């Protein structure tokens, strides 16, 4: 155990030092703060548990450093500390709750600018020097460059000694303009601002529109009791202070503080500058001193950090993928970025029309987001470094069959296409469908490539012990795969029906079928033998349109699909599912719901599952066809949209009885 712990500590220290250099020296970080913080916390945890392995060179005892050899190192007059940070609002509230305000609640809230930290030293009202934060003890002297920033006063009206902290930044608009002309574009405005500030020739720096907000002062050159008075004085002296800083006192509640944070989050995309969080500070300076400091941060301040909603990256290549329906989807392989809590190395480009509309090709710098915090997507071209736009090939990359266009998408029409076949098997085994544990995409692809399986039914006939001759497959693993296959035979009919991959047939439509007495294979098969009668019958079900009705009828007249159903029936799969709706649950049955907010004692997934079991149908977004929106605490934008569409609102109290 000890050697493993020592090795993990050594690996963490090596990795953190690498990231420190990338962030502070190179201005080219490869990971987001969220990831860095997790590794620091893990190292702190290990060093606390095994103090005998904590060394004097540990990153937990030091600060990151932006010191460069190109600039003179100068000692700060006092340690320049970092901020403690949280990524969870509950933890932020907990931090506020722990502060003893002595019946004098006082806190300031301001956006956390995503820029380059700077410390300004004024002597007798004259800017004497400007240092980077450096390692907290020493910083690089960038005075000559800082003097070119027009928003920093070189002389003050009063002969005072001040030490101020500020954040140098560049606006989103100027970032895009400047990045176009750089041989090696920066991935974000923070790195660009940092890079400009560290240019050796100050004449070059003067050509760039750097900006600054002053957010703190570190000495007693001006005597004030509270942060709001100090901020007002700084503004009067000519310093630029963020106008969004807001001060809360006894007249306010913690709820109002959290509401203001929510308002900043909501409006962040409209700001002219990038922010990566908000900063909360105790306003009363006497209380600040009582709360004190750690070696790393003041105890009277806390940063609530956001996970990035989007970021910029370069497109290295574009590939086309073939899905289970044969749909051809172009995908961009990009430089790794961290967005909404996850690393992204690829992003969907939707279809040929979309690529043409944004004019994208390999080599371009693009804006990447995670739509709905799930699917990575390229939103727009930021810098065009290529000519023309990417064109989807005329032939399927897997089977070379000529592709056909249906609407905005290209499709491979070959039902025997190997990519289509393997994607169908992956879908069949997926968590939302048959949920066959152990059958990862990698294992399914391996079985397919070795020609052990060609379709879903082969999973139930293959002798898995043949895998013993391959690396990575031992008795235990093979037995687990076999047990998972056997367990799948007990899944409800709704899961089997979903797993068959009938076009546009999802969980909600299946529930509608079941609620209308079409809850078995035999009933669906019998209905669909008379196509015209089936079509009119299905259209009478609210929520089923012409397209899905035709797809259902086609599927239950397709010989390949029917043979699969017969195969599973012979294996004694469940071919019928009873949906029992009693009088109490009639309100829910077949109705379309959406959910927003939090629910005391219940996760959203539990609420959804319990109501689904009683016949409710859930949508992920608010549309005009919705019957009810279930609203918990801290409801989001869905509530506003639902009200504008006159959709009925249900509270937690309205649904509580259905959750028992």
From Swiss-Prot:
Enzyme Commission code: 6.5.1.2
Keywords from the named record: DNA damage, DNA repair, DNA replication, Ligase, Magnesium, Manganese, Metal-binding, NAD, Zinc
Family that this chain belongs to: Belongs to the NAD-dependent DNA ligase family. LigA subfamily.
Binding site for Zn(2+): 396, 399, 412, 417
Protein name per Swiss-Prot or TrEMBL: DNA ligase
Role: DNA ligase that catalyzes the formation of phosphodiester linkages between 5'-phosphoryl and 3'-hydroxyl groups in double-stranded DNA using NAD as a coenzyme and as the energy source for the reaction. It is essential for DNA replication and repair of damaged DNA.
Boundaries of every BRCT domain copy: 583-660
Requisite cofactors: Mg(2+); Mn(2+)
Organism name: Borreliella burgdorferi (strain ZS7) (Borrelia burgdorferi)
Catalytic activity: NAD(+) + (deoxyribonucleotide)n-3'-hydroxyl + 5'-phospho-(deoxyribonucleotide)m = (deoxyribonucleotide)n+m + AMP + beta-nicotinamide D-nucleotide
GO-annotated biological processes: DNA repair; DNA replication
Location of the active site: 112
Binding-site positions, NAD(+): 33-37, 82-83, 110, 133, 167, 281, 305
InterPro entries: BRCT_dom, BRCT_dom_sf, DNA_ligase, DNAligase_adenylation, DNAligase_N, Hlx-hairpin-Hlx_DNA-bd_motif, NA-bd_OB-fold, NAD_DNA_ligase_OB
MF term (GO), any: DNA ligase (NAD+) activity
Phylogenetic classification of the source organism: Bacteria, Pseudomonadati, Spirochaetota, Spirochaetia, Spirochaetales
Keyword DNA damage: yes
């Amino acid at each position: 155990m000890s050697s493993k712990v020592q090795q993990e500590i050594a690996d963490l220290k090596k990795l953190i030092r690498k990231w420190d250099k990338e962030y502070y020296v190179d201005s080219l970080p490869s990971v987001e703060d969220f990831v860095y913080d997790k590794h620091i916390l893990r190292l702190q945890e290990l060093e606390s548990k095994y103090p005998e392995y904590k060394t004097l060179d540990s990153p937990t005892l030091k600060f990151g450093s932006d010191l460069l050899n190109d600039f003179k190192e100068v000692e700060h007059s006092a340690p320049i500390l970092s901020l403690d940070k949280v990524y969870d609002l509950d933890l932020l509230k907990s931090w506020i709750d722990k502060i003893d305000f002595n019946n004098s609640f006082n806190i300031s809230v301001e956006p956390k600018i995503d820029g380059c930290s700077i410390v300004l030293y004024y002597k007798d009202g004259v800017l004497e020097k400007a240092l980077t934060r450096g390692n907290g003890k020493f910083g690089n002297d960038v005075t000559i460059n800082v003097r070119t920033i027009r928003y920093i006063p070189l002389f003050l009206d009063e002969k005072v000694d001040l030490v101020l902290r500020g954040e140098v930044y560049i606006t989103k608009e100027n970032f895009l303009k400047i990045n176009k002309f750089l041989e090696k574009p920066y991935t974000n405005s923070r790195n660009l601002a940092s890079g400009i500030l560290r240019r050796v020739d100050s004449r070059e720096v003067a050509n760039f529109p750097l900006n600054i907000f002053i957010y703190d002062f570190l000495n007693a050159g001006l005597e004030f009791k509270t942060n709001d008075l100090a901020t007002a004085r700084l503004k009067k002296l000519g310093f630029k202070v963020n106008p969004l800083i807001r001060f809360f006192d006894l007249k306010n509640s913690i709820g109002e503080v959290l509401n203001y944070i929510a308002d900043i989050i909501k409006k962040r995309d409209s700001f002219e500058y990038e922010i990566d969080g908000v900063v909360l500070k105790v306003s009363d300076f006497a209380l600040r001193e009582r709360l004190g400091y750690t070696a790393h941060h003041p105890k009277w301040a806390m940063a609530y950090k956001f996970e990035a909603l989007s970021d910029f990256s370069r497109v290295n290549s574009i590939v086309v993928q073939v899905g289970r329906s044969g749909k051809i989807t172009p995908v961009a392989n990009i430089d790794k970025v961290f967005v909404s809590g996850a690393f992204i190395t690829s992003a969907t480009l939707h279809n040929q029309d979309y690529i043409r509309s944004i004019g994208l090709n390999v080599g371009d710098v693009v804006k990447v987001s995670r739509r709905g915090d799930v699917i990575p997507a390229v939103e727009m071209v930021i810098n065009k470094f290529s000519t023309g736009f990417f064109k989807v090939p005329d032939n399927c990359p897997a089977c070379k069959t000529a592709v056909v266009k249906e609407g905005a998408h290209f499709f491979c029409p070959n039902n025997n296409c190997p990519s289509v076949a393997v994607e169908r098997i992956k879908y069949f085994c997926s968590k939302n469908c048959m949920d066959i544990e152990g059958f990862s995409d990698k294992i399914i692809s391996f079985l397919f490539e070795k020609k052990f399986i060609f379709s879903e039914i082969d999973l139930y006939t293959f002798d898995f012990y043949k895998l013993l001759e391959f690396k990575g497959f031992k008795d235990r693993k093979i037995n687990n795969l076999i047990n998972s296959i056997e367990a799948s035979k007990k899944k409800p009919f709704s899961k089997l029906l979903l797993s068959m991959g009938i076009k546009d047939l999802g969980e909600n439509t299946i529930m509608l079928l079941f609620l209308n007495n079409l809850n078995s294979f035999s009933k669906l098969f019998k209905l669909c033998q008379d196509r015209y009668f089936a079509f009119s019958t299905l259209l009478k079900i609210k929520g089923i349109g012409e397209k899905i009705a035709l797809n259902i009828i086609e599927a239950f007249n397709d010989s390949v699909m029917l043979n699969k159903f017969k195969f599973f029936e012979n294996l004694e799969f469940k071919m019928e599912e009873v949906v029992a709706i009693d009088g109490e649950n009639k309100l829910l049955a077949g109705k379309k719901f959406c959910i927003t907010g939090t629910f005391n004692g219940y996760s959203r997934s539990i609420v959804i599952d319990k109501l689904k079991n009683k016949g409710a149908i859930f949508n992920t977004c608010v549309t005009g066809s919705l019957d009810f929106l279930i609203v918990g605490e801290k409801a989001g934008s869905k509530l506003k949209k639902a009200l504008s569409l006159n959709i009925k609102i249900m509270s937690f109290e309205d649904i509580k009885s259905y959750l028992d």
